[in-house]
Regions:
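PLP-dependent amino-acid enzyme catalytic core
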Residues: 1-195
Length: 195
């Protein structure tokens, strides 16, 4: 019915040129082909769907999120498809391309000046989102940095897909690595792969 139904189910791809015939197999979860172009669309969708289930969103809600990029792209996409307004707050040092994508999805992008300390700038973005929420009852801040639904997107989705793919191929997992931002990807997938 809509593009959000295509989120997930990304392929697990074997990297053949990185290893020799007697080395371990290296497999990557190819999230670049996910709707929205990254793994963050999974978390955006999960956080918004769970918020809807809890009654935290209404038709006039404004989704506001501080981010350095890909989560904003995912939330802008999900908001556009579901009919919500979106405001993404990000450091001005983040890529112009990401900003443009979010704007094309209909999000308002608010840039906070980065004085050279990205951590301080992100904290300023978070504080601005919190002020917006305090000032306007329509504002919903998913809070990717502390939202357990971020983790659940990987437990229920990404990790389950990896396990299904390796089991179908008869492959045992000896190790796992992941990029690290909010910690949701590595924590969610890692917790499931340990079991």
């Amino acid at each position: 019915d809509n593009v959000l139904e295509a989120v997930g189910s990304t392929p697990l791809v074997r990297l053949r040129r990185m290893t020799g015939p007697d080395d371990a197999q290296v497999l990557v979860k190819f999230e670049a082909v996910n709707v929205g172009g990254s793994v963050k669309t999974r978390t955006a969708l999960k956080m918004i769907e769970r918020a809807e289930e809890r009654g935290e969103l209404s038709p006039d809600s404004i989704i506001v999120e501080p981010t350095s990029g890909n989560q904003g792209v995912g939330l802008a996409l999900v908001a556009a498809v579901k009919g919500y307004a979106a405001r993404i707050i990000m450091p001005d040092s983040c890529s112009v391309e990401r900003r443009r994508i979010m704007e094309h999805y209909g999000a308002e992008v608010i840039c906070v000046h980065d004085e050279g300390d990205i951590g301080a700038c992100i904290r300023e973005c978070i504080a601005l989102a919190q002020r917006m929420a305090a000032d306007d009852p329509r504002v919903f801040v998913p809070q990717q940095f502390v939202n357990r639904d971020n983790l659940a997107a990987h437990v229920d989705g990404t990790a389950a897909e990896i396990l299904a793919d390796v089991r179908a191929a008869g492959i045992a997992i000896d190790g796992f690595c992941s990029g690290f931002g909010t910690g949701g990807t590595i924590t969610g997938i890692g917790s499931e792969l340990r079991t």
